[in-house]
Amino acid sequence: MEQLWLFENEDRISELHEALLVHIMSSLPTKTVVATSVLSKRWRHVWKTVQNLKFVSKYHQTFSEDVYRFFMLHKAPFLESLDLEFSNQLDASDLGILVGIAFARHVRNLVLDLDYYSNFSQLCAARFPSGLCIYDNNKTLETLTLKHSILLYFPYRVCLKSLRKLHLYKVHFYGKDSVYNLLCGCPSLRDLIVHRYRECMETFTIAVPSLERLTIEDSGFGYGCCYVINAPSLKYLNIRRFKYLNSCLIEKAPELAEAKVSDVSDIENENILESLTSAKRLSIHLSPLEWWNLLTFMLEASPKLQILKLTDLNMSSTKGNQIGQKWIQPKCVPECLLFHLETFVWTGYEWQRRDEKEVARYILRNTTSLKKATFSTKPIEPVKLKVFKKRREILNELASLGRASNPSDFVFESI
C-alpha cells in the first residue's frame, strides 16, 4: 500500500527531458509558465527558455515594466512567438522598446494589440517604431499582426524580407505613402489581411508581386475608399462588407483560383469581375439588395468555375426582389454552367421565394457537368404538414431538373 502511495505522488513530470518540458510549457499562459519556477530547483530556470510568450494587460499600470523585467531574466535567444495585448494606453517609446526586444530575440511571429481607445482617433494611437524596420537587420519575422490603436507611419521603405503574413486590423495609416512603403518592403509576403474602419484615405493601393492570399474587410459605413490591387500571383481573394463593389479595382490577377464575396450591397463597376476569369471556386454570401445581379455578373465573369457556393444564413425577409423588380436571366448561358460547374451548394436556400426558385431552376437546368448539388433550408415544424409537403415538391422538382441534364448527387439538409 505504501509503494502504491509513493507511485501516485511521484513527480514524474520533472523526470522528462528539459526540451520536452519547454515544449509543453510553450502552450501555457506566460504568467503560468513563470509560476512554475517555485515548484523545485529543477523548474527554477526552465521558464527562461520558453519561446512562445503571451502577455495580456488588464489595465495594469506597471505592465510595461513587468514585461521589461521578464525579458531581463529570460534567456531564450530566439522567440517563436510574442503576443502583447494592452488594455491601458501605451507610450510610443514603450512600444518601441518592446518591439526592439522582440526583434533582438529574432521573433518569428509578432502580435501587437493596443485595444484601449474610447474613440477611433489617431490622437490616442501609439506610433509603431518604423525605424526598426528600415534596416536589413530582421531576417526572421514571418508573421506580423497589428491591431487597433497603432499608428503606422513609414516615411521610408521598410526591409522585412522574411515576412510572409501580415494582418492589419483597424490600425491607422499616416497617408498612402506609408501603405506603399510598408507593402513594397515585404518581397516575400504571401498572405495579407486588411480590416479597415473609418480610415480617411481615398486610395488604398496593394501592389505586392508575391501576394497569394488577400482578404479585405471595410467597415467604413460609406466613408468611401478605393482599393487598387496589383497582385499577379494572387490565388485567393476574399472581399467583405463593401458598400459598393465598384470601389475595388483589380489591375492584374491572372492566377486567381478562388474568390469569396460577402456583404456587398451593390455592384456597378464590372472591372473587378474581369479578374475572375481564371477562378474555379466562388463563394457568395447573399446581401439584401439585388443579390441576383451580383450572382449573374459572377457567373458570366468566371468561365472556368467548378465550385459555386451561395450562403444566406440570415434568411432575411428583406433580401431579394423589391416591388417592380425581378431577376433577369443572362442573355446567353454562362460558359461555366455549360462546361465546368461540378459542385453547387446553397446554404440558407429560401424555397418559398420566387427569385430564389428561379435562380436555382436556371442553374440546374443549364448545367451539363454537375456532379453534386446541396440545398440547405430552414427546418419546418412537424405540425406544418402542408408547408412540409410544399417544400418537398419544390426540392423534388429541383432534383428532377438536375437529373434531366446530367446524373447528379442531390443532398437536401436542414440548418
Curated annotation (Swiss-Prot):
Signal peptide: none annotated. It holds the Pfam family LRR_At5g56370. It comes from the Eukaryota. SUPFAM superfamilies: F-box domain (SSF81383), RNI-like (SSF52047). The keyword Glycoprotein does not apply. LRR repeats lie at residues 60-86, 87-114, 143-170, 171-196, 213-241. Keywords: Leucine-rich repeat, Repeat. Residues 10-58 form the F-box domain. InterPro entries: F-box-like_dom_sf, F-box_AtFBL13-like, F-box_dom, FBD, FBL13/AtMIF1-like, LRR_dom_sf, LRR_FXL15/At3g58940/PEG3-like. Residues 272-377 form the FBD domain. PANTHER family: EMB|CAB62440.1-RELATED, F-BOX/RNI SUPERFAMILY PROTEIN-RELATED. This is Putative F-box/FBD/LRR-repeat protein At3g49040.
